Amino acid sequence: MINGVFLREIASILRCDLSLIISEFEYELLTKTFRIDAEILFYLPFLAEEIEKNTTSFQKRQHFVSIGNFLHEPNWQTVLKLKQIWKYIRKNLPEAELHIYGAYATEKVFQLHNEKEGFLVKGRAVSADEIFRKYRVLLAPIPFGAGLKGKLWESMKFGLPNVTSSVGAEAMSRDLPWNGFIEDSDEEFINKAVILYTNESIWNQANENASVILEQVYCKTVHIQPFWTTLYKITDHLDNHRNTHFLGKILQHHQLNSTKYMSRWIEEKNKNLLL
């Protein structure tokens, strides 16, 4: 876990006056495991300004959907997993289709397209909002990747229940009931996808769960005022804040000096080249 990228990110946090952390899991990891001072961190997740109540009903929706740009490796691996398990879902629901959306889809992605199997690669979505409003179930067997998943948050906003993995649901809902199902085994994932697609009462309950999650975890009014209070407190006492968290000053000092001496080295090297 501790590698060059990790050390660079921790150093960046220490050099900053305040870092915004969108995941409670990562916030606790930083404060409890790596002992980063909570005064230079602020938990600020995705913010839901207004919760949409009149979402498209179960009966007016159809088909499964997966969405995510293909520059992000977990999205590609998610689609590969769906390609493996889709035939088993399709066996139970022969009229259902799975539509795959995502920007930057290359030829290898479009090669997965198979109309006979009902596995349709659509490419870039013109309007993500429209996508979330017309499908019945979002499938997201995400195999790896940290942080909050935007597609799952959007699915809550637009009344689109989902089946995802424990990685996908990480830090998304605290301990509140999920808006769908969280399954890591292929067998259970397939089973829950079929149930969520066919059982209207379970589907409606999933949407009720989504409303609760949005109100208790992502409500803008809950988070925004404490954020501004913290920001103004730091800016009003900036020198004291920086002196208290002197590790950041040490790192900035060494970073600036390393740049200064590197520039001198380059100057001397260029002089020698001109001789």
Task: Annotate each language-model stretch with its function.
Residues 1-19:
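Membrane-proximal helix-turn-helix segments that form the acceptor-binding/catalytic region
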Residues 13-15, 20-21, 27-47:
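Helix-loop-beta element that forms the nucleotide-linked donor phosphate-binding surface
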Residues 17, 133-147, 158-160:
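Acidic donor-binding loop of glycosyltransferase active sites
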Residues 32, 41-133:
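Conserved catalytic-core segment of nucleotide-activated headgroup transferases in glycan assembly
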Residues 151-155, 161-165:
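Short hydrophobic beta-strand element within catalytic cores of glycosyltransferases
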Residues 166-177, 181-182:
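Short acidic/histidine- and often glycine-rich active-site loop of Leloir-type glycosyltransferases
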Residues 179-187, 195-200:
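Conserved acidic donor-binding segment of nucleotide-sugar-dependent glycosyltransferases
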Residues 202-204, 211-275:
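C-terminal amphipathic helix plus adjacent low-complexity
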